[in-house]
Every structure is written in structure tokens, then in C-alpha cells.
């Protein structure tokens, strides 16, 4: 039992140390805009996708009703709120970036930090995104959730 408690305490301390990463350790970028709640473009035209989260997507096509075959109204308000929240967080600020990998679309997958706070984690905590279980292993903060 004592070994188990020591292991749990060690794990929690390690996560706390990784979770509160200081933006002083990472290079800084500035963003010119955000496409949605998890993808932005830097002033150097680098497309960055926030690691470990999934935000609402833009609905481009109306779904058809099976009975009448007419387009039904679709709602992009969740998409817009998520994108607006991310824009409010990163616009006009120098943002620390920890590049992780490149995705199949050529975007940089990265964690972003503002004032020692993880931007992806802020999107999740505010309800504008969810943790992507498939990619949660890339971020220490997402593993504990």
C-alpha cells in the first residue's frame, strides 16, 4: 500500500510539473487569425492545430429530411463561439508554442501557452472544445482528465 501511495504521489507531482509549463521555455509566435476552435494561422503563415483537443466543426452542407427532401436549418453557433473564444485568447499576443508533430494536412500540431496557461486546456475548461481521447497522450494535462 505504501508503494502504491508513493507511486501515486510521484505521478501527480510529475503531471503538475509538466502541466504548468512556462512559456519562457518555448519560442513565441503571433497569430493572424483562427479558422475554428482548434486551428489558427501565425503571421508567418504556419497553420497550427491545437494538440489534444477537438472543437466543433463548420457545417458546410445542409442535411436533408428523409420525408420531404428539403434542406433543414443547421446551426453553426457552437463552431462560431469556439472560434471566437480562441481568437480572443490568442489575438494580438505573443504565444509560447511547443511543436509536437505535423498532421496529415501539413499543419503543425502544438500546445500553445499564454501566461503559463495552456490554451487548449482553457478551450476545454470553458466548454468550447473536448479532449480528443485519440491524441490525449500528447499532452500531460489531458491524461489526467
Residue ranges of model-derived segments:
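Small beta-barrel nucleic-acid-binding modules, primarily SNase/OB-fold domains
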Residues: 2-145
